[in-house]
């Protein structure tokens, strides 16, 4: 039996309004619990369009057929008009998710975090995280115990800033296994649960065809030597590719693969490490990546 952490990122208004209810229904039918990370502030994701001038981002958008994958409402959100606030407008959906799944913070403003947080000072970053946590806690009526940095944009500054909130764990980076990042003080910080597997948009049209993706991914899962964690997006697997996700769950069950919330992957003893800036094939720009203590 292979146990895989299932992380669901919710980046946009439509992903919350349309994708999350569909995913909740699918997961219920398959008796699966997951960790769902919500963006709760303004939906300004359309402002990423300026990145089309970067060849790597343009190629990603073309090979993944982004217009049909996400829809023009997502691709243009927050450009010609102010971005709609996601959280309180979809409070009932978020509360329903929290009844059955582990719920954490993805971002206050996903676009702002991904595009500008690397230039923020620590207090600005703390204030932004606090705003998102406060909003999510108001919605679900209970403390939030986990978070996942938007776009995996995390480095030592993010790790230090999140220590102020005493969360149970964060999932801010890519890597191989859960670990505790070393702080500037030399002490171990809040546990990190890295994503280990590629996302749909990172590999479609580059490493694998859409129709072959599920078999390709299951092969990666079964060969994973660490602690496998897979991320889906409400805007993708909850919308245009929900049928592919259902097929993945059915095939996974046949292969003895089970899915669980990320918190179930934690153990009392974790290795030490750091979150450093790195690159992942198929994704434009830098991401937080796990570095085991003592390695270079």
From Swiss-Prot:
The record, for SUPFAM superfamilies, names:
Glycoside hydrolase/deacetylase
Which terms under GO biological process does the entry name?
4-amino-4-deoxy-alpha-L-arabinopyranosyl undecaprenyl phosphate biosynthetic process; lipid A biosynthetic process; lipopolysaccharide biosynthetic process; response to antibiotic
Record's PROSITE patterns?
A: NODB (PS51677)
EC category: hydrolase
Question: Please, which domain of life does this record's source organism belong to?
Answer: Bacteria
Q: Which reaction does it catalyse?
A: 4-deoxy-4-formamido-alpha-L-arabinopyranosyl di-trans,octa-cis-undecaprenyl phosphate + H2O = 4-amino-4-deoxy-alpha-L-arabinopyranosyl di-trans,octa-cis-undecaprenyl phosphate + formate
> Which keywords annotate this record?
Antibiotic resistance, Hydrolase, Lipid A biosynthesis, Lipid biosynthesis, Lipid metabolism, Lipopolysaccharide biosynthesis
Q: Which GO MF terms are attached to this record? A: hydrolase activity, acting on carbon-nitrogen (but not peptide) bonds, in linear amides
Where is it found, in Gene Ontology cellular component terms?
Answer: membrane
The EC number(s) this enzyme carries:
3.5.1.n3
Every copy of the NodB homology domain together lies at: 2-260
User: Which pathway features in its UniProt record?
Assistant: Glycolipid biosynthesis; 4-amino-4-deoxy-alpha-L-arabinose undecaprenyl phosphate biosynthesis; 4-amino-4-deoxy-alpha-L-arabinose undecaprenyl phosphate from UDP-4-deoxy-4-formamido-beta-L-arabinose and undecaprenyl phosphate: step 2/2; Bacterial outer membrane biogenesis; lipopolysaccharide biosynthesis
Please give the family membership noted in the entry: Belongs to the polysaccharide deacetylase family. ArnD deformylase subfamily.
Q: Which PANTHER family match?
A: 4-DEOXY-4-FORMAMIDO-L-ARABINOSE-PHOSPHOUNDECAPRENOL DEFORMYLASE ARND-RELATED (PTHR10587:SF137), GLYCOSYL TRANSFERASE-RELATED (PTHR10587)
Q: What does this protein do?
A: Catalyzes the deformylation of 4-deoxy-4-formamido-L-arabinose-phosphoundecaprenol to 4-amino-4-deoxy-L-arabinose-phosphoundecaprenol. The modified arabinose is attached to lipid A and is required for resistance to polymyxin and cationic antimicrobial peptides.
Q: What is this protein called?
A: Probable 4-deoxy-4-formamido-L-arabinose-phosphoundecaprenol deformylase ArnD
Q: Which organism is it from?
A: Escherichia coli O139:H28 (strain E24377A / ETEC)
Identify the coding gene.
arnD
């Amino acid at each position: 039996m292979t146990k895989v952490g299932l992380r669901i990122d919710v980046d946009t208004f439509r992903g919350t309004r349309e994708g999350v209810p569909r995913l909740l229904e699918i997961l219920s039918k398959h008796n699966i619990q997951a960790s769902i990370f919500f963006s709760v502030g303004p939906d300004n994701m359309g402002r990423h369009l300026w990145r089309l001038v970067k060849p790597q981002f343009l190629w990603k958008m073309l090979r993944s057929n982004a217009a049909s994958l996400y829809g023009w409402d997502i691709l243009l959100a927050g450009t010609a008009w102010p971005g709609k606030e996601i959280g309180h407008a979809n409070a009932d959906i978020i509360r329903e998710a929290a009844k059955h799944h582990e719920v954490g913070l993805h971002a206050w403003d996903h676009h702002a975090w991904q595009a500008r947080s690397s230039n923020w000072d620590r207090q600005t970053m703390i204030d932004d995280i606090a705003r998102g946590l406060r909003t999510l806690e108001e919605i679900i009526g209970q403390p939030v115990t986990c978070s996942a940095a938007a776009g995996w944009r995390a480095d030592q500054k993010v790790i230090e800033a999140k220590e102020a909130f005493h969360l149970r764990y964060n999932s801010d980076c890519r890597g191989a296994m859960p670990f505790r990042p070393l702080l500037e003080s030399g002490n171990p910080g809040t546990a990190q649960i890295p994503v280990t597997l590629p996302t749909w948009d990172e590999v479609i049209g580059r490493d694998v065809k859409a129709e072959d993706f599920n078999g390709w991914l299951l092969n990666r899962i079964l060969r994973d030597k660490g602690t496998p964690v897979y991320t889906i997006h409400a805007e993708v697997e909850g919308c245009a590719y929900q049928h592919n996700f259902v097929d993945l769950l059915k095939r996974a069950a046949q292969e003895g693969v089970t899915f669980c919330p990320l918190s179930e992957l934690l153990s009392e003893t974790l290795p030490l490490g750091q979150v450093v800036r790195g690159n992942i094939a198929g994704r434009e720009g830098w991401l937080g990546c796990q570095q085991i203590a003592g390695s270079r």
